[in-house]
Amino acid sequence: MRFGKKSLFALGLALSLGLGAFSGAIAGDNGGHGKSGHGSHWTYEGEGESGPAHWGELSADYAVCSKGQSQSPIDISGAQDQDVADVEFSYEASAINILNNGHTVQVNYDAGSSITVDGADYQLLQFHFHTPSEHTVGGRSFDTELHLVHKNDAGELAVVGVLMARGAQNEAFADIFENLPEHAGAVEKLDADVNADGLLPTDRSSFRYTGSLTTPPCSENVKWIVLKTPIELSDEQVDGLHEILDDNNRPVQPVHTRKVISDTAR
């Protein structure tokens, strides 16, 4: 039996005390993308009282969700070309476990994989999914978005976003999508290792900007690297993920005075 959004949230809430692999704004799920450690009950229920429009009212810890000037996601348009150093990806194969935390399906990753951005190393902690995409490009939404969450030694976050569109079957995700936990609180552990490098497009050109977590507490000063080239998933893969997650995307937020950089990978 598959659970819809409301059922997932209710069950996830009941199990929340038993899920705590981490605590706090960052540790709640290695970057705040999912169930936060603060305990206020937020959802994706549109205009509902716990939905995205009201996250900033649910807790003083979430105030930046409504008051912040550097919130994510955004619609990416008018990006400025800039010659910047490529993001260096140093991913290793990892044993993984897949957690359904009631807000997303999160894949926890072993230590030892990283990216280098602007000369700083960020360790890969986990990746997870949003359906449909959170970022849009020139107003265009995509079927799914993958977020790979990284943290450096200073506790600062960098998130790589991968846009995903319907197309051919993507074998790189086969083991993951065949073992998606359907119930909130459920965990699946894969026997086979997965290398996150194989989940990314070959062309690593990107849009970069400074933003926030896309879930409460919506903490800012997150480095965002949204890869320009979408990857494909089959209808079966997209629909299977959406059947579990329903719509778990925060609406796009105002860009305000931020600059979005467009870089071309060498």
Task: Enumerate the predicted regions with their spans.
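Alpha-carbonic anhydrase
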Residues: R2-S7, G12, G20-R266
